[in-house]
């Protein structure tokens, strides 16, 4: 009986240890690999500043292209696709938080007009569902359903992201009108260079904080370097810490200047933003246009028939 209790206690302790380890892993890993859309959500009420700049550019410093494709016009209460393309060389590898090389992730923020929102699952067609695959979209804020974020997701699989969007109906939403509206998009590939608190990530260039002579370079056990710089004028020592990832460009005994790069730039990613326009079309206006075109076609047909009839009359009179 005592042996059974002992075995049960050991089993419970092992399960508890595994659970605690898993929780610690999730907490410590999330800010490194899965948190960069959350950085913007936590720090900014609106992802688009008054200047038109999307705040993701504050952390992703390199400028890269992004493209968005939407229909020219949509009818009310209709599901349509907004396709965001984040192009990059799929062979590229980025510096991860631990200093090793790995594949790039991508992410995007889509800023829709007020009233437009993510389409509910029961309104999405099988064709669009196939394009979406396993992607999970979320609102930037519970109160901002027109702003959607996605990522990070594997760039090799999702460099093209399809958002299923539901257009509003002015008949039920009085603040929505049949107009032309702008749509804004931001898309990044790879990790950022700056964290929200202003500190550098290891996906960045590290510069000398002092001029002088590099007197000592210590390679740290877990990667990275400690570089000691001695000021030639007063002998003051400054130690610059380089995290794992960037490649060192200086050597011991080398004379360096203030702000001189100590490392290469490991960043291969970047952020881009773009915009598009979409018209919320009034169905009555479309019907009116179709009727107008139909009337023109009928008028042309009657005109041709009348002309042929007139020609026949003329021909018969000439024969008479």
Swiss-Prot record:
Cellular compartment(s): Plastid, Chloroplast thylakoid membrane
Protein topology in the membrane: Single-pass membrane protein
Residue numbers binding heme: 36, 56, 59-60
Classification via PROSITE patterns: CYTF
Gene3D superfamilies reported for this sequence: 2.40.50.100, Cytochrome f large domain, Single helix bin
Domain of life, per lineage: Eukaryota
InterPro entries: Cyt-f_TM, Cyt_f, Cyt_f_lg_dom, Cyt_f_lg_dom_sf, Rudment_hybrid_motif
Record keywords, A-Z: Chloroplast, Electron transport, Heme, Iron, Membrane, Metal-binding, Photosynthesis, Plastid, Signal, Thylakoid, Transmembrane, Transmembrane helix, Transport
GO cellular component, one term: chloroplast thylakoid membrane
Record-linked Pfam families: Apocytochr_F_C, Apocytochr_F_N
Signal peptide bounds: 1-35
Main location class: plastid
Transmembrane segments: 286-306
GO MF entries: electron transfer activity; heme binding; iron ion binding
A GO biological process held by the record: photosynthesis
Manner of cofactor binding, per the entry note: Binds 1 heme group covalently.
Needed co-factor(s): heme
Function: Component of the cytochrome b6-f complex, which mediates electron transfer between photosystem II (PSII) and photosystem I (PSI), cyclic electron flow around PSI, and state transitions.
Family: Belongs to the cytochrome f family.
PANTHER family hit by this protein: CYTOCHROME F, PTHR33288
Subunit structure: The 4 large subunits of the cytochrome b6-f complex are cytochrome b6, subunit IV (17 kDa polypeptide, petD), cytochrome f and the Rieske protein, while the 4 small subunits are PetG, PetL, PetM and PetN. The complex functions as a dimer.
HAMAP family with a match to the protein in the record: Cytb6_f_cytF
Protein name: Cytochrome f
Organism: Morus indica
């Amino acid at each position: 009986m005592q042996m059974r209790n002992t075995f049960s206690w050991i089993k419970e302790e092992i399960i508890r240890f595994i659970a605690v380890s898993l929780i610690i892993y999730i907490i410590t890993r999330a800010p490194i690999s899965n948190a960069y859309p959350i950085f913007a959500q936590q720090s900014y009420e609106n992802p688009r500043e008054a200047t038109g700049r999307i705040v993701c550019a504050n952390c992703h410093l390199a400028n890269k292209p992004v493209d968005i494709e939407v229909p020219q016009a949509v009818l009310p209460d209709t599901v349509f696709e907004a396709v965001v393309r984040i192009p990059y060389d799929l062979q590229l590898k980025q510096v991860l938080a631990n200093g090793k090389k790995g594949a790039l992730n991508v992410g995007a923020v889509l800023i829709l007009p007020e009233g437009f929102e993510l389409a509910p699952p029961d309104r999405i067609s099988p064709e669009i569902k196939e394009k979406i695959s396993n992607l999970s979209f979320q609102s930037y804020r519970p109160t901002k359903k027109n702003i959607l974020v996605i990522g990070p997701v594997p760039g090799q699989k999702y460099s093209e992201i399809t958002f299923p969007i539901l257009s509003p109906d002015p008949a039920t939403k009085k603040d929505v009108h049949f107009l032309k509206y702008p749509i804004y998009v931001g898309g990044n590939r790879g990790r950022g260079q700056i964290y929200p608190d202003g500190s550098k990530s290891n996906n960045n260039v590290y510069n000398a904080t002092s001029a002088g002579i590099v007197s000592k370079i210590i390679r740290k056990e877990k990667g990275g370097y400690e570089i000691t710089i001695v000021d030639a004028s007063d002998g003051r020592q400054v130690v610059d810490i380089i995290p794992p990832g960037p490649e060192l460009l200086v050597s011991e005994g080398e004379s360096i200047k203030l702000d001189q790069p100590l490392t290469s730039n490991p960043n291969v990613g970047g952020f881009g933003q773009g915009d598009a326009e979409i018209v919320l079309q009034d169905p009555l206006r479309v019907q009116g246009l179709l009727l107008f075109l139909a009337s023109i076609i009928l008028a042309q047909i009657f005109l041709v028939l009348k002309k042929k009839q007139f020609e026949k009359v003329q021909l018969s009179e000439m024969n008479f």
